[in-house]
């Protein structure tokens, strides 16, 4: 079986976003480490590697790298569907705003404390805020539906 090298399957959208050229996509630890090093070596606050080959695909799969602690402001996609987060490295909080604010602490398997989960699945129309609490974090975001920046609603604050 002829397996494609990771480097041969990368389409560089810009410095902060790379995408797979072909499917199926396979990544090993070395590939993920190479992506993380790209983010760190280029002083990128955030870096995203999209596993889908097209933003119009019905399933969006993104490896997201945060190079240092940071907060992604409140956002949602009112068109609906689901979004799933899985922490590969580090610790993040996913803060949800529904009737009340709820904080879900997610972490990789090294955080053996039972306070932490490693994954969460939530409706896309719920406002959420992502807070990276470790020096660096890597997490997988899987979202139903195609992706357009204009489908995301952003808020700086949830205060009325």
Task: Label the model's feature ranges.
Residues 39-43, 53, 74-76, 118-121:
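Short, solvent-exposed secondary-structure boundary motifs
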Residues 1-59, 105-112:
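A short, N-terminal "cap"/entry segment at the start of jelly-roll beta-barrel domains
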Residues 99-115, 129-160:
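Double-stranded beta-helix
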Residues 61-65, 84, 119-121:
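Conserved hydrophobic/aromatic beta-strand scaffold that supports enzyme active sites
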Residues 73-75, 94-96, 120-122, 128-133, ...:
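Short beta-strand His + acidic residue motifs that chelate non-heme Fe in jelly-roll/DSBH
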Residues 67-68, 79-100:
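Glycine- and acidic-residue-biased ligand/ion/polar-headgroup-sensing regions
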Residues 51-60, 70-86, 115:
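A short beta-loop-beta micro-motif enriched in histidine and acidic residues
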């Amino acid at each position: 079986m002829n397996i494609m090298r990771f480097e041969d399957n990368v389409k560089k959208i810009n410095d902060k976003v790379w995408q797979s050229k072909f499917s199926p996509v396979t990544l090993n630890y070395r590939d993920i480490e190479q992506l993380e090093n790209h983010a760190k070596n280029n002083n990128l606050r955030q870096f995203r590697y999209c596993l889908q080959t097209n933003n119009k695909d019905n399933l969006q799969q993104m490896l997201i790298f945060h190079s240092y602690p940071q907060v992604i402001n409140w956002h949602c996609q009112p068109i609906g569907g689901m979004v799933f987060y899985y922490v590969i490295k580090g610790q993040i909080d996913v803060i949800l705003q529904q009737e009340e604010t709820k904080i879900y602490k997610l972490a990789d398997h090294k955080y053996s404390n039972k306070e932490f989960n490693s994954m969460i699945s939530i409706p896309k129309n719920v406002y959420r805020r992502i807070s990276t609490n470790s020096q660096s974090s890597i997490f997988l975001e899987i979202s139903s539906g195609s992706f357009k920046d204009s489908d995301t609603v952003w808020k700086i604050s949830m205060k009325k």
